């Protein structure tokens, strides 16, 4: 759902007014323990155009190339964090793509590489995101990305989706030079919001991020859009659902 600017401005203004009233009432009544939501990127960002672009450019090979690319994206991030050799997610994503092309024996020209990387700057939000974010704001909840994405990558999604004004400052892992699930990354939410861990919901997309957030101490909601299996890491999310409407219900339950 891409809101036109007039409709969005009206909804956002209403949400801020309602937030001021409702947040005070909720705290006074002791109804909800939550005061903010920190989002991983992908509960908000729809990554499917990347897969579509891969198949368009490399028919019959797109799925294999994409699988290797995604795996190496996160493995490279984790390895760089463990080794103290941080590079931002844009660089990690490009390096992972180059490896994936070699591993799948696909000849990737510089122009093709650039076109695939550009897809990340063209991504938009999932259709259920805009109304859900307005509902969360109206319930008095503060919102921010806490993501491995760079700030320019997050800014692009917000522009592409017409979501200006809903999120606070981006908490990109670039700020601490450590990718999730490093505790330094999750700590950004506590520091930025100025709240206790138990007052901040972490909205995760991947099972490993559920585990990382739970280990850190956040109440964690798994936005399991792909119906993925839970990881065997000894933790269970506090809530789970297929979309942001489920997160809204969890965050605003009395």
Predicted regions and their residues:
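A metal-dependent, Asp-based hydrolase signature
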Residues: 77-114
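Active-site neighborhood of HAD-like aspartate-dependent phosphohydrolases
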Residues: 30-71
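Boundary at the C-terminal end of the N-terminal hydrophobic targeting segment
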Residues: 24-28
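Asp-based, Mg2+/Mn2+-dependent phosphohydrolase catalytic module
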Residues: 3, 7, 39, 134, ...
């Amino acid at each position: 759902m891409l809101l036109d600017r007039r409709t969005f401005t009206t909804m956002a203004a209403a949400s801020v007014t309602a937030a001021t009233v409702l947040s005070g009432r909720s705290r006074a009544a002791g109804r909800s323990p939550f005061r903010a939501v920190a989002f991983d990127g992908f509960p908000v960002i729809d990554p499917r155009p990347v897969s579509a672009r891969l198949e368009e450019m490399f028919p019959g090979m797109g799925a294999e190339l994409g699988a290797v690319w995604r795996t190496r994206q996160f493995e490279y991030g984790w390895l760089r964090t463990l080794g103290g050799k941080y590079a931002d997610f844009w660089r990690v994503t490009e390096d992972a793509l180059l490896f994936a092309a070699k591993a799948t024996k696909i000849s990737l020209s510089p122009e093709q590489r650039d076109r695939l990387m550009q897809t990340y700057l063209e991504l938009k939000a999932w259709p259920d995101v805009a109304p859900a974010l307005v509902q969360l704001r109206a319930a008095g909840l503060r919102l921010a990305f806490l993501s491995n994405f760079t700030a320019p990558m997050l800014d692009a999604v917000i522009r592409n989706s017409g979501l200006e004004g809903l999120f606070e400052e981006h908490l990109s892992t670039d700020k601490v030079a450590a990718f999730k699930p490093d505790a330094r990354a999750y700590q950004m939410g506590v520091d930025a919001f100025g709240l206790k861990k138990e007052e901040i919901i972490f909205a995760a997309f991947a099972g490993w991020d559920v585990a990382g957030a739970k280990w850190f101490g956040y109440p964690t909601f798994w936005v399991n859009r792909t119906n993925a299996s839970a990881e065997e890491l000894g933790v269970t999310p506090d809530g789970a659902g297929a979309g942001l409407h489920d997160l809204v219900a969890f965050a605003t339950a009395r």
